[in-house]
Amino acid sequence: MREQVHARNWFVGLWALLLLAKIVLAARLPLFVDEAFYWQEGQHLAWAYSDLPGLTAWMTRLGVAVGGNTTLALRAPFLLVAAALPWLVARITAREFDRVQGWRAGLFTMLLPLAGTLGVLAVPDAMMTFATLLCMDAGARLLRSVSATAALELAVGLATGALSHYRFLAVLGVGFMVLLLLPQGRRALRDPRVMIAIAFGLAAWTPLAAWNLGNADAGLRFQLVDRHPWTFHADGAWFLLTQAALVTPLLFVALLQSAWRHRGDPMPVARYFAWLGVLVVAGFFGLGFFADTERISYHWPLPGYVALLPLLPSVLQRWPRWLRVATTTLACAGLLAMLGYYAAASIPALRAQVAGEKGYPHNFAGWTPLAAAVRDLRASMPADTRIVADNFKAGAELGFALGDANIAVLPHPLNVKHGRAPQLRLWGLDAIDRSHFGAHPLLLVVGASEVELKNLPAQYHALCARLGPLPPPRVVNVDHGSQRFLLFALDGEKPAGACTTPAMAWIDEPLGGDRVDGTFDVAGWAFKDGVGLDAVEILLDGSPVAHAVYGLDNAGPKRFWPISDDPHHPRVGFRAHVDASRMTGGRHWLGLRLRGSDGSVEDWSEQPVEIVR
């Protein structure tokens, strides 16, 4: 009894503390770009969308309808669902094994970093995990005896999963296969009540199927074809290391051992959990050798780990005490690391410290200063000005910040890459060119950092073809330009004339991260198609420290970008001598101020240098 009370107290204490931490993070963390698009979908209610079934969008709509247009309100339904998951795991485990193991399984549901952080973001995984647990619970009950309540729970779980994500098909397929492998499962599947539940769950896929039938299978093609190479690549071998790191190494081993130990358990429920969990994880492992490696996919196996959690306490009981302590400690560290990442992403000063690094949270950063700049510029423009974004990310994030779910978006590779182009087209928000807006003035928002440098000139010239020559932009550099936006105020009519684009530049010397003395040289190139540049200034920590000699021979940019028509080619090189002897040693940020012949002033992205003494 004392052991049970002790386990329960630890569970309740961690649950309350974790929920409080997640509420604070959900209130402070800027919206991830996918969350912003789900909000936009929620403002255009439908049964299904180009990227997902409808449930995630409906939940975002519910959140903001009840709590207002804030990040916490948007995420609140997901937080509530995520808060229920440890209790559900504890309940399932206690019923099938014992109460002490139930509290411990629930505790490790929170310590498992991928599960413990659910709800901080308004993404489908919270509901998909909830659906997995409902189906697990129903399946376990059906293995003992078929009842109307178990069949009803199965129906609700299957329908919830179908309305959550395409990936639930993996859970559905594996769960059905495992039930077929068990004699008790085959008996349950023959019962009419279970057949009705399965039919109800399958019917829940109807909205998604109907959407695809009406839109040339655009959603299916994106999820199953377009985003995956479907050719073997060795990157899938990183799956085990990545998952071991995310789950935390000892907990990962313990979960796999749980599956192995119970694979032939005399208890059908234990075998059911073991095979359900390991086959889901193994399936995604195999898929990793053929599937998409560019987008985030590390969370895909989560339903498999959740299925193994009820088996975990019995395995850990057999481990030495020091190993159990190490497992718990590592899991706590992993959970804190993931929560810490979200915390750092929510604090501009901390986020700026990793600007330019691989771990920089691009999809969380810059939206608040961008919205402030858009509001400011829009206030100086005519009342009938229309905002247009060059990609869906900026359109959705600005839409949430400004309370406008109908910001038009130009064609962009990102819209296609993330499967959002068909949905924008259905909403009538895909602005092909200037004619989409009639005679309205435009405030064009361009995410310059969303396009690789090698592709920027082509992207800028494509903007010219759609909207005409671009006027001098207002530059919004966030975190030293790791996120860089350009704002253009366009008149009502498409102007004639040659294409004028934003400036481009590169610093060849010193390179980012180089160590430099108190005095050092800066060299590189810069150009601005259509009009050219008049001057280049060198900045340190945002302040001018030198005027560069501009107009040196450098044929490289024109050779690399034949499309470029800066009138100064090939004399687009620059060099300057910087005296930073009065500055403190340590890390500083080196940047450029590019002055165009059209009067534009554009600050280029900064790069770090280390001044040594």
Language model regions located:
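Membrane-interface alpha helices of multi-pass inner-membrane proteins
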Residues: 44, 138, 150-165, 176-177, ...
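Membrane-interface transmembrane helices that cradle and orient dolichyl/undecaprenyl
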Residues: 94-100, 135-153
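Transmembrane-lumen/periplasm boundary regions of multi-pass, lipid-linked membrane glycan transferases
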Residues: 171-270, 276, 280, 284-291
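Luminal/periplasmic acceptor-recognition loop/helix of membrane-associated glycosyltransferases
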Residues: 358-497
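Short acidic/glycine- and proline-prone juxtamembrane loop motifs at membrane-interface regions
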Residues: 114, 120-128
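Transmembrane-helix motifs of polytopic, lipid-linked glycan transferases
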Residues: 12, 76-97, 134, 138
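Short helix- or helix-capping micro-motifs
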Residues: 15, 105-113, 137, 158, ...
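Signature aromatic-anchored transmembrane alpha helix within multi-pass, membrane-resident enzymes
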Residues: 317-351
